């Protein structure tokens, strides 16, 4: 099968420099969603017709199985498909999709393709309560489709028809090539309509069939930021529904955003306002508190993430305790039962089982052993202005509050670092290491009297 995706439009009503088809739905370009759905049909040719912002569109969705055709002037849908003709195989039917209609399901497209087979003309239609602005499906007395009439060219009688054309069609490619060559632009829009091929097919006695989607939202197009927001909410609602059906507890299905792929084990609970980006896995019994942002991370069974945490490209071991207000940056790997508390940031560090940094700390470019306690205010000083250096903290270390570990430095097994220490050399195993000024009290000192300047 050939699949042609029309993605050349400017999208004036978006009021944006970004090409319309690159505006995101669930964190990915609309066009990427359409391409993903098209791939489920295993096409032999997948052609994207580009125009406005062509290079940006090409870069955004380039892949080995995608080819491009350029429409230099936007002269209508028929003209757009003409640009793809040199890349199509006449021995296979062609399915036409739209880069700004991102929610059409694979099941709906398969139903249309199966209805059309290799010899019929298939049209995806829907009935709308208010069909204003859409091309109407005109049928004869026997119920067969004879033509599609665009809104601006329709009579009052035709405008009363509620069945509309979604624009998605499939037909034999050889016929399509011939019909496109006969299109005229003598209409209210001055464009070459792809829909006019329906009338050509009817005139030649080609059987015209239709299929309908399971839901109206599958065919919603995006021409404005208002419509983009509507499509986003529908998509998120559908994703939330699937999570609920697999046993995930959502505090409010209307207040979760999944911008990628979220997989969950059993008895997972997600509070309100959470955003999941990229690939995220939540193991059995994981609890996610309110207003967390989690990106490209895995969280193992039994872990708890308290509210307002940011987790990016990290691995959290079983039974971990994160937050609230914690930040895990790329390269963070936490073992079993690791506690990372409020206002603690961990970056590019490996922390072994049962270790804790519960308050106000920065752990960057570090290797932390098991059963380590990192006191409040501890900082790994990992950057000298040009290069990053690692800190190594071995098992069973206790680090007192307000400690600076100036990398590269190692704290050996079982060592204790006194509060307020600035550590610049290796701390030996099982010993107390500290560096601080000797405390003094000046008995004769009096606080000076200070007067405000007049």
From Swiss-Prot:
Any Gene Ontology CC annotation: cytoplasm
InterPro entries named in the record: Bifunctional_GlmU, GlmU-like, GlmU_C_LbH, Hexapep, MobA-like_NTP_Trfase, Nucleotide-diphossugar_trans, Trimer_LpxA-like_sf
Residues at which Mg(2+) binds: 100, 223
Keyword Manganese: no
Renumbered residue ranges of the record's region Pyrophosphorylase: 1-225
UniProt family annotation: In the N-terminal section; belongs to the N-acetylglucosamine-1-phosphate uridyltransferase family. In the C-terminal section; belongs to the transferase hexapeptide repeat family.
Function comment: Catalyzes the last two sequential reactions in the de novo biosynthetic pathway for UDP-N-acetylglucosamine (UDP-GlcNAc). The C-terminal domain catalyzes the transfer of acetyl group from acetyl coenzyme A to glucosamine-1-phosphate (GlcN-1-P) to produce N-acetylglucosamine-1-phosphate (GlcNAc-1-P), which is converted into UDP-GlcNAc by the transfer of uridine 5-monophosphate (from uridine 5-triphosphate), a reaction catalyzed by the N-terminal domain.
Protein name, per record: Bifunctional protein GlmU
């Amino acid at each position: 099968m050939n699949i042609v995706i029309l993605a050349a439009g400017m999208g004036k009503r978006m009021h944006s420099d970004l090409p319309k088809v690159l505006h995101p739905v669930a964190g990915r370009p609309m066009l990427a969603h359409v391409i993903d759905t098209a791939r489920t049909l295993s096409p032999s040719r997948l052609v994207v017709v580009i125009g406005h912002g062509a290079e940006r569109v090409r870069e955004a969705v380039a892949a080995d199985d995608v080819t491009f055709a350029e429409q230099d002037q936007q002269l209508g849908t028929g003209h757009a498909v003409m640009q793809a003709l040199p890349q199509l195989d006449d021995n296979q039917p062609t399915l036409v999709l739209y880069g700004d209609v991102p929610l059409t399901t694979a099941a709906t497209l398969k139903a249309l393709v199966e209805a059309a087979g290799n010899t019929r003309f298939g049209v995806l239609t829907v009935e709308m309560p208010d069909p204003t602005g859409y091309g109407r499906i005109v049928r004869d007395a026997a119920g067969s489709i004879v033509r599609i009439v665009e809104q601006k060219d329709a009579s009052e009688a035709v405008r009363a028809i509620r069945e509309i054309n979604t624009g998605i069609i499939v037909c034999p490619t050889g016929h399509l090539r011939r019909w496109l060559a006969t299109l005229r632009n003598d209409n209210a829009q001055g464009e070459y309509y792809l829909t006019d091929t329906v009338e050509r097919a009817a005139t030649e006695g080609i059987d015209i069939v239709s299929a309908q989607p399971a839901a109206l939202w599958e065919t919603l197009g995006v021409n404005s930021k208002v419509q983009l927001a509507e499509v986003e909410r529908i998509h998120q609602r559908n994703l939330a529904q699937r999570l609920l059906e697999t046993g995930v507890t959502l505090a409010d299905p209307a207040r979760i955003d999944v911008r990628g792929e979220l997989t969950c084990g059993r008895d997972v609970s997600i509070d309100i306002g959470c955003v999941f980006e990229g690939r995220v896995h939540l193991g059995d019994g994981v609890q996610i508190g309110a207003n967390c942002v989690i990106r490209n991370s895995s969280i193992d069974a039994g872990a708890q993430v308290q509210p307002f945490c940011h987790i990016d490209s990290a691995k959290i071991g079983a039974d971990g305790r994160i937050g609230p207000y914690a930040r895990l940056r790329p390269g963070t790997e936490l073992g079993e039962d690791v506690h990372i508390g409020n206002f603690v940031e961990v970056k590019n560090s490996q922390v072994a089982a049962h270790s804790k940094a519960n308050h106000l700390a920065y752990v960057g470019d570090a290797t932390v052993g098991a059963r380590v306690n990192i006191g409040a205010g501890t900082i790994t000083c990992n950057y000298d202005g040009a290069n990053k250096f690692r800190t190594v903290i071995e098992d069973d270390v206790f680090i007192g509050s307000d400690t600076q570990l100036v990398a590269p430095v190692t704290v050996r097994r079982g060592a204790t670092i006194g509060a307020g220490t600035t550590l610049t050399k290796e701390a030996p195993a099982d010993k107390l290491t500290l560096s601080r000024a000797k405390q003094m009290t000046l008995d004769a000192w009096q606080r000076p009297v200070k007067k405000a300047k007049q």
